[in-house]
Amino acid sequence: MFIRLLLPVVAILLFLIEPVFALFSPVEMFDRIIYLVPRFLFMYLLFLAVYYDRKKSIIYGVIFGLLYDVFYIDIIGLYAVLYPLSCIFISKIVKYIQQSLAIVTILTVFFVALLELVIYEFFFLISFTSIGMEDFLLSRLVPTIFANLLFLILLGWIFKYFIKTRKLQSV
């Protein structure tokens, strides 16, 4: 019973922890202000799509995407569409490649970068942001990728362990 509740509880905790880590941003380094955007929940959803169940990761993606839209950005539908789409794409990709932790980590970081780019382009398109692409790349995208990669290196194996444990329990 405990393992059954573990997957949604971890997702809820990650959803609640992200804004706490966002408080550490912006940071001034190398005469530049950098922004670190935690994407812990998004990475967890991608791990669910790869190691557990694509359908459940899509459902979690829609639910938490809507919650993210409502509580953090006030534009309904952006994350509610991007989270499940990313889960679908990564689950399709891993059918053709090895599902080792290193490969999934690289793919997850790639999807974090892609998510950040799509969100930036959307906000730029609706004039919600005015920073240029170069500033975005240097002050937000690259630091966000490194920060989330560090998080995955530290906790990715724990994600995989919990998800695999739940999968074995359901068999």
Predicted regions and their residues:
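Terminal, non-globular segments
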Residues: 1-171
